[in-house]
A protein has these predicted regions:
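Short, charged/polar "capping" segments at the starts of alpha-helices
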Residues: 15-18, 43-51
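Short beta-alpha junction loops
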Residues: 40-45, 115
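Short aromatic/hydrophobic "clamp" motif used to bind/position activated sugar donors
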Residues: 108
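Acidic donor-binding loop at a coil-to-helix junction in glycosyltransferase catalytic cores
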Residues: 256-266
């Protein structure tokens, strides 16, 4: 089978998480020859060690620190626009989108370097199954036209990016038919992805939420109803080539504090 999946991992920390995802693929019989791993890192990180890891794992891929990205922009004739993908920011994930667009990959997968797959779940295979889903699926909507992706949990959590004004919504579920899925949003166990205010409400001044999520919090797949929005977290996401532009992460640090933590949640909105 052709190498049709571009796996984008922005990393300045635990880049060896890639080994766990590759082990998961092999354990579940997923063909790793389909994968091309793009590690997006910085000049102060050990890019050579990352390249050595990809070689050891026998997987195709490339590592781009800031200098490598500048060279790539020059080669593509787009150096004048390099500021649209900020360095040393999670929004550098957008470089992986550009690389994927310039290639002939049919699918993209985002992975954060502080995550690991569950051994019992086929990470890549499940995402691809979702993208090829054809048939019935649960449809979720609300009277606020926002869907809380954690609505199945009994913990009453709202993920980072969910509007405060849309909380306490009335959730409605139905069954619909779908034959064209463009994005598969995975969820996460253990530490939930909350914003600062919700972490303080659920946790303490140490910046750590107290609630933990587990298997029982996510027991079935669903799609958002037509006309409803939902939040997107790019730590566990697969998508088709046709929607690459929707996942561009805008630079959000153009302010007096140089703070830009809301990069990925605005994908597809602005």
């Amino acid at each position: 089978m052709s190498r049709d999946i571009c796996v984008v991992v922005p990393t300045i920390r635990e880049y060896e998480c890639v080994r766990a995802y590759l082990d998961n693929a092999r354990d579940h019989g997923f063909d790793t020859d389909r994968l091309f791993v793009v590690l997006v890192t910085e000049d102060f990180c050990d890019a050579e060690a990352m390249r050595a890891m990809l070689d050891e794992e026998g997987v195709a891929g490339a590592v781009f620190d800031e200098s490598d990205r500048e060279q790539w922009y020059d080669e593509q004739g787009i150096a004048d626009y390099d500021h649209l993908v900020p360095a040393a920011s999670h929004a550098q994930t957008s470089f992986g989108l550009l690389y994927m667009w310039a290639g002939d990959f049919e699918y993209g997968v985002f992975i954060d370097d502080d995550t690991l797959p569950h051994d019992e779940w086929d990470f890549f295979g499940t995402h691809l199954e979702n993208l090829h889903h054809d048939g019935e699926v649960e449809e979720v909507s609300s009277d606020e036209h926002w869907v809380n992706v954690l609505y199945q949990s009994e913990a009453d959590l709202y993920p980072r990016g969910y509007p405060y004004a849309a909380m306490d919504e009335t959730v409605e579920t139905d069954t619909t038919e779908t034959d064209h899925v463009v994005a598969s949003q995975g969820l996460w166990t253990n530490v939930p992805d909350l914003d600062a205010v919700r972490i303080l409400m659920d946790g303490d001044l140490q910046g750590q939420a107290q609630t933990r999520t587990d298997f029982e919090d996510f027991d079935r797949d669903f799609v958002a109803g037509e006309g409803d929005y939902l939040t997107v977290c790019s730590m566990n996401l697969a998508f088709r080539r046709e929607v690459i532009p929707a996942f561009y992460q805008f630079p959000m640090d153009d302010n007096a504090w140089d703070v830009g933590r809301f990069d990925d949640i605005w994908s597809g909105v602005l």
